[in-house]
Amino acid sequence: MPVKRSTLVKKLDKVFSQYIRLKDTDHAGYVSCFTCGVTKNWREVDAGHFQSRGKYATRWNEDNVKCQCKRCNGFRGGEQYQFALNLGTDLADELVYLSNQPARLTNDWLLEKIKHYQQEVKKLL
């Protein structure tokens, strides 16, 4: 029986989030919030999106997703203004443009990305 697309999306979300939270950690496993700068263990932060996860064209774009503390990402709605400032005008504008482009995701593409990020996470752990 073929795997459902929703299952693949959830699996990619999980491994991509791990990768984003791990890639900028220091030797002790701590990372700074992209928007407020507070330092936390990578397991205690979120993978915060500048452009919403609902926009598949940028959902798994590494430039669009950064480590954010739960306060900034959850309680403060992602701190979009500060997120944009920290990204810089050119990159923020590019991500807004990209997020409005159509995204045609195939199961093969999702499986390829899952495999890629699983390998990247394995290297970082």
Task: List the model feature ranges, each with a label.
Residues M1-Y19, D24, T39, V96-L125:
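A boundary/linker detector
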Residues V3-T7, C33, S52, C69:
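Secondary-structure junction/capping motif
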Residues K4, L8, A57, F75:
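Conserved aromatic-histidine-acidic binding/catalytic patches
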Residues D13, K23-S32, N61-V65:
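Short metal-coordination and nucleic-acid-contact micro-motifs, chiefly zinc-binding Cys/His arrays
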Residues S32-N64:
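Histidine-centered nuclease catalytic patch
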Residues G37-N41, V65-D90:
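Short Cys/His-centered divalent metal-binding micro-motifs
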Residues R53-C67, G88-N100:
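Short microdomains enriched in Cys/His and/or Lys/Arg
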